[in-house]
């Protein structure tokens, strides 16, 4: 599961502490270990890093826009051809958040290595600017306010819209649809990068398991190897992975 679930599991006593040695820890990107640390202890092995990206139809749009501000004009151009520029899930904040956060919006202020839950940045000037831009896209009929995950996914996979915003979990369905697609970073807004939430797909060990050492052996010497992750990735795309050596191979693709 993604790492955001693991704090609750650990709090309930469901996860065993893991103790990989430094040599193994060095094989993975350091920030991924931070995602699976609870009260100073490691509670899972990071597998992959999931985040939203811009997915585009290469046949409809060989060169995707670099900025959100380009999208209205692009949509007008594509509408003249019976297509639309962009459709994505507008029903869940997870998908709209990257735009809201781009110019300075934030959930909780992060300072000195911790979050201040009393400092919420969803109504500051940057958040309002991003949300206003999104509302204007809807008001000007560049997007439909009723668009949800399934509607957006179907439209992209049928070639009806040139772009969508989704994560690596969506790639296998696009592969099945035979759309000629590319994946790139989300557009910038007012010169600032979009800021999606990041999930670290992780594997933990049940605290009640009688086979903790076997589980550790499997995770460290089979799953978290180039060959192990390649086998998983062929079945279900992982996106970016925590293992440095295999991520370097993926980066060549």
Please provide the spans of the model-predicted regions:
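Beta->alpha turn/N-cap motifs
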Residues: 1-5, 149, 165-171, 201
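Hinge/lid segment of periplasmic solute-binding proteins
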Residues: 2-52, 63-75, 80, 98-99, ...
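Short, solvent-exposed loop/beta-turn-alpha elements that line the ligand-binding surface or hinge
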Residues: 19-28, 63, 106-129, 176, ...
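Extracytoplasmic/periplasmic solute-binding protein
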Residues: 41-47, 52, 72-119, 161
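Paired acidic/hydrophobic, glycine-rich loop segments that form the ligand-binding mouth/hinge
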Residues: 162-166, 182
């Amino acid at each position: 599961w993604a790492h955001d679930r693991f704090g609750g599991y650990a709090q309930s006593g469901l996860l065993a502490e893991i103790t990989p040695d430094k040599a193994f820890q060095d094989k993975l990107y350091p920030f991924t270990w931070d995602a699976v640390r609870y009260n100073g202890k490691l509670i899972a092995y990071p597998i992959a890093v999931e985040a939203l990206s811009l997915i585009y139809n290469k046949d409809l749009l060989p060169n995707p826009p670099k900025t959100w501000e380009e999208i209205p004009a692009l949509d007008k151009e594509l509408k003249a051809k019976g297509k639309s520029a962009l459709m994505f899930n507008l029903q869940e904040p997870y998908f709209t958040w990257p735009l809201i956060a781009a110019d300075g919006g934030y959930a909780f202020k992060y300072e000195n290595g911790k979050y201040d839950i009393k400092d919420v940045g969803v109504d500051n000037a940057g958040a309002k600017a991003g949300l206003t831009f999104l509302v204007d896209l809807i008001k000007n009929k560049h997007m439909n306010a009723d668009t949800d995950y399934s509607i957006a996914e179907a439209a992209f996979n049928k070639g009806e819209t040139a772009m969508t915003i989704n994560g690596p979990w969506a790639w296998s369905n696009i592969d099945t649809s035979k759309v000629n697609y590319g994946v790139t970073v989300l557009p910038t807004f007012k010169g600032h990068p979009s800021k999606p939430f990041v999930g670290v797909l992780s594997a933990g060990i049940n605290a009640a398991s009688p086979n903790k050492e076997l589980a550790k052996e499997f995770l460290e010497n089979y799953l978290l190897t180039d060959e192990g992750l390649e086998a998983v990735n062929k079945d279900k795309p992982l996106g970016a992975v925590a293992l440095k050596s295999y991520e370097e191979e993926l980066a060549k693709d």
